Amino acid sequence: NQQTAQQLLEIIATAETMTQRYDVVVTNPPYLNKMNSTLKKYVKKHYKDYSADLFSVFIWHNINMTKVNGYAGYMTPFVWMFIKSYEKLRTALLSNVKIDSLIQLEYSAFEEATVPINTFVLKNTKNDETGTYLRLSAFKGGMMIQAEKVQEAIADPGVKYLYRTNQTNFTFIPGTPIAYWAPGAVLRAFHKNTPIYNIARFRIGLVTGDSMRFVRYWSEVKFTAIGLNISNDYEARVSRKKWFPYQKGGDFRKWFGNNLFVVNWKNDGYEMKHDNYSGSRLKSHNFNGDFAFQQGITWTKISSGAASFRFVPSGYMFDDASPFGKITDKKRDFLMAFLNSKVTNYILGLLNPTLNYLPGTIEQLPLLRAENEDQITKYARSSLAVSSDEWIQYESTWQFRNFPILSHIAEHNRNWTVEAAFNQWKQEAQDRFDQLKKNEEELNKIFIDLYGLQDELSPEESDKEVSVRKADLGRDIRAFMSYFIGVTFGRYSLDTPGLAFAGGDWDASKYTSYQPNADDVIVLTDSDYFGDDRDIMHRFREFLTVTFGEEHLEENLTFIAKALGKAGDTAEDQIRSYLFNDFYKNHLTIYQKRPIYWQLDSGRQGGFKALMYLHRYDGDTMAMIRTSYLHTLQAAYEKRVTTLNTFIASETNTRQKNQLIKQRDHTRKQLEELVKYDAQLQHVANMHIAIDLDDGVVVNHQKVQADVKLLTPIK
């Protein structure tokens, strides 16, 4: 009939349009990598090599819609230029057509959606002519700025961000990335065919399938349950330990560090390997094999900036986020030096600017021989020593031995000022920083010269590129206060290096010069309500007297108070204010929201605040805090209200009287809040809740509160 005939004509017209060859084809194709089953099946059947995304299908399809010497223009995400998923597309294009021109836009220039974009023109011909490329990555400010830079390049082809190159050069680089800005020196380095995989093997790491179940910060679990210094699977099994050190990536840091995690690998990872828990989104795999517990090199796979490589001693497993390379001792230092140089990051930017550093990419880096290898090794070993020494200065690491400001108090017979101790530490930190910066700049110079990249790179580094800390008075005094809390809980001891107690059996002989609190509680108050060692400032005075001597006590209190920067009439008031209002915020930062001290908090009025130490907690802790401390503080509040009422009745000065009334009313509010909190605490205390440290902080923090809110949230 007529309707059917019309439909057939429309289909024929569409088919003719789709099969016709054109002089020019231009499109902004759809970006879609998650296709429905019908589309996915079709794409896999007809465009298998280009099926990573629908836009890559259109790239190939559209150039085949053009006549010989015709042009196809596109605007697409620029990932096709670099990542492995599109390697077959790149190979096909480089073999069959010409990239006539390409503009790589700044990452967020396309304001309608933050998608890294390039726009390019392909010519349906095979020839050896050079293409023209504009790299606008450095020019932020949206499409207006991008357009201006394009116009500038048209007017002046000599601008530094315009490149002309033959696309054959891309085939010299492993993976054939469209690295149009690669200088000839780098191409020659690749051409020598001396990739890193000739001396090292790299592997992606373990996927646990459920990090909340199988991975912990080391400080969450009982320290004696961690298997340290393990060298192979057999030692791990016979140790009967549950937790083992685990590399899991982390922030930018070179040479050594980011050793913060442990993984449940008890009995060769039996629980993980046999995980049938329905809540697991992804089953575990990549179990490390013979790479487990071996020394080597790791890095953070996905970075927001430069790559940084770290030495890993034996005893670690490694995560998917932290790939691992195994190498002999003989070449370790040379390879570490090269990987942490500016040259490596420059070449990685050619291979994959998406900042996703996969093992295959690292293995392909060209490693040239150097005449001055002994000098390189010397700088590398010095850098590793500096970085590892700095890493253990912080209590968030299990290698922590002693707080650095206290390192030299024995030389002064514990009769010294905190200011002098800090200044000595400050100089040591500066010397360490300067040494590492010098080492890295010397290595940069050596490798820049070796690879002939003097026109592209300079050896100098900015301070932010040096991954050890300088001293910082505010931060370091806050850390000193944290150490004091740890000593008062018995986690640390002034007489025993490293951890004194983190689960297991309590050993009173470890504490001689300063005794930790007998109970698992430190009450935080805005004033001294106890008049004895239950008051935090009494304990802090004792701590300072033991460490720095009584002669300098007031001077030291003043220095510390100034560094903490809190308001108050006296130095003691200022320090008390920090502990009462800000200590716990800093603690959450240090322990990355997995606190080892938990803060009981009655609410806005601060009626009751106290810390308890996770590793000393038991089912009777809440009852002890309530009866021995909360009720005592309640009586103190009641007494203060009575006293203030007496003062108010006899005070004739209006201004003074109003101040007393304000104090009384505030104390009344604290008392009312405390009484309400007492009822909640009693409810939980009567339950005698036990915890299992293996469950981790998130689970246990919620568990000990039952169905009420007793603790400051982990945020």
Functional labels for PLM-detected ranges:
Residues N1-Q20, V24:
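Class I S-adenosyl-L-methionine-dependent methyltransferase module
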Residues Q3-T4, A200-R213, N229-I230, N258-V262, ...:
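Short coil/turn segments at secondary-structure boundaries
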Residues E10-E16, H61-N62, L105-A109, I230-E235, ...:
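Generic recognition of flexible, low-complexity loop/linker segments
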Residues E16-Y234, N258, D268, H274-G279, ...:
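Signature of N6-adenine DNA methyltransferases within the class I
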Residues L32, N62-K67, S322-R332, N345-I392, ...:
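Proline-centric
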Residues D233-D290, T298:
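Contiguous C-terminal substrate-recognition/catalytic subdomains in enzyme active sites
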Residues D290-S308, F318, L335-G349, Y584, ...:
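Short Ser/Thr-interspersed hydrophobic loop/turn segments at strand-loop and sheet-helix junctions
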Residues P404, A410-N413, A420, Q427-K438, ...:
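Terminal accessory regions of large proteins
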